[in-house]
Amino acid sequence: MGFQFQNQPLWKRYRSEFPVTERLIYLNHAAVSPLPRRVARAMKDFADDACEFGSMHYDTWLAACEGVRLAGARLIGSHRDEIALVKNTSEGICAIAGGLDWKPGDRVVAFREEFPANYYPWKRLESRRVQVEWLSATDPLDRIEEACRGAKLLALSFVQYLSGLRECKGHR
């Protein structure tokens, strides 16, 4: 059975992880997406363990988190100490916006059409005299490159919130 699974096209293997596709054509992946079967199973296993044993297996849970950090580090070619696990993208963006050592005159480049969680944290920095250069997702690459010179941070989504457009700005 596993061999047959491996011979399926990649999209079919992924699709089989999402039971919602058996009932719906699901297109709303912008903020809250359906859980893959394996994620739902892992969450259930964790909840059952916590329910039945309390914190007795806390060391195992921490080891699992460290394994995820290590896998993430390998994936992007970094060290696991550079990987933080957060609940969601919004929490991560807020942690970065609130956690960096911002000084008056520091510059951020951001986009007006962003999802609110990637807009308001940078907008809020303006009150701390951080300069935010607001661009449009339709600006040409040269304009974006120019704006990024000397900037401390570029806040850019891979998939555009309003249009769903997946930009490959770095590819020419």
Where are these regions (language model features)?
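Pyridoxal 5′-phosphate
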Residues: 1-172
